[in-house]
Amino acid sequence: MSNEIPTLRDPQDRRLPRISPPCGLVIFGITGDLARKKLLPAIYDLANRGLLHPAFSLTGFARRDWSPQDFEEYVRASIEAHTRTGFNEGTWNQLRSGLRFVSGTFDDPEAYRRLADTVAELDRVRGTGGNHAFYLSIPPSYFPVVAKHLSDTGLNKRQGREWRRVIIEKPFGHNLESARELSDVISQIFDEQDVFRIDHYLGKETVQNIMAMRFANAMFEPLWKANYVDSVQITMAEDIGIGTRAGYYDGIGAARDIIQNHLLQLMALTAMEEPVHFTPEEIRAEKEKVLSAVRLPEDLAIDTARGQYASGWQGGAQVRGYLEEDGIPADSTTDTFAAIKLFVDTRRWAGVPFYLRAGKRLGKRVTEIAVIFKRSAHVPFGNSALSESAQNALVIRVQPDEGLTLKLGAKVPGTSMQVRDVTMDFAYGHAFTEDSPEAYERLILDALVGSAPLFPHQREVEASWKILDPILSFWETQGQPESYAPGTWGPQSAHDMLARDGRFWRLP
């Protein structure tokens, strides 16, 4: 543990080239798991790398009856347990001087008056300059009451060149109607340009690298079209169950929790056209074009699949099925696995199926985008020389082991012509000596500096729900989801969905 106060970041460090202005961040739900494990460590790591202005302040808002010292101890413990850059007393002392805590419930007007007084005191004493962001790390059901009190106390109002912003966590509603209702609540007190919707997957280095790989390398972009691409598979798999999240997860499920935001955003980045300029407006516009061009399959019964994990053995241990988890009703129809087939009706992607799947208690923890290329039209040494899966593929590994894998055919050493699949791998951890910023570091800094390319616009949110709502409505009429064994890759119906098309799921 070092006591030396760190200097500003290395000027050659271009991973996060901007520094926040003088500002404050207010976190509602400061005692939740997200704040404790992700937000507080990310804020500290930004400060530890010299990327937060010395005037930065952090205010927590929660029901706990804490003294300032209690709050400091909580923040420090969270940082020490989860920091990525190592604990430094100098950084901590600088950050600690800007810590404040306001005790109160979300519906307590007096608590918001105390919060307004705290914000004014920080502007006066700390020099935050009237710039404040409000992070709603709380369930969406509390958004209306928090928004109302922020408005009633004038905390959403700015003067001159000051700014006030709001950062909200998913889910952005549970269907199109509720998403619009939430947007209406927020838009009454904040302009759209001041609303930052967090999808932490968009802050991951590999996701941002999709655009760099496509548009900075002439070898990939010419092949990135229906002429050469057979299909695209986007997978987000977890090898764990719901744990203690029954209250959140039941009634939401894999499709709402993962496909509606993470996977449709990954699909949009994969399928979008090159923006004229690398600006938030133009990147968002290209993603919106993709989402608006999505077409559902005609028969949802055979081209979608949903499931629930059953009890069984996984990783050498006996695990409970979803319906046996604490807090889950015995008749729950919530999906813990979801798979869908979509089409993007543009000239580039006409006829190319996009297969999206997400689930819990699957074979391994992995998130990847696999662009599967068409087989060679003619092979001079005969198809018998090829392996059964002889298709080139470019796989973008989002997590873990971030990187790229190119699958291609190569001759097996020997006297006969036999071609087998081999891979060429690029791994971030091997190619770059420095660590990539954690996703929340990038997103929090972007929100503080007002850069929005990695934050979905409300139009993207609504377009995503327009895609998913018909599927969810159909599933509601289908009774209980199909069960699948833990440690497998989902229900049989998901495999049948691709088998009918003469394809199979890639094994990550």
Walk through the language-model features, giving the residues of each.
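Secretory/organelle targeting and membrane-embedding segments
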Residues: 1-168, 172-508
